[in-house]
Amino acid sequence: MRNKAKGFPNQVNHKFEGEPGATDAYASKRPNGETNTRPQERMRASGKR
C-alpha cells in the first residue's frame, strides 16, 4: 500500500522546514571559486554549530 492510501503526510511540503543547510562560512569554495584551505578545520567548525 502506498503512502497516499495510508494517509501519511505529504513529505514534499516539509522539505524546506527546519534548520537551513550549510552556510557560506562552512562552504568548501570561496566566493572567487578557489578551494578553501584547511578543510578539517572547516568541517570541525561546521559540526560544532
Curated annotation (Swiss-Prot):
Residues 1-49 are annotated as: Disordered. The keyword Methyltransferase does not apply. InterPro entries: SASP_SspK. Residues 39-49 have a biased composition (Basic and acidic residues). GO terms for cellular component: endospore-forming forespore. GO terms for biological process: asexual sporulation; sporulation resulting in formation of a cellular spore. Keywords: Sporulation. Its main location: other. It is found in: Spore core. Induction: Expressed only in the forespore compartment of sporulating cells. Belongs to the SspK family. This is Small, acid-soluble spore protein K.
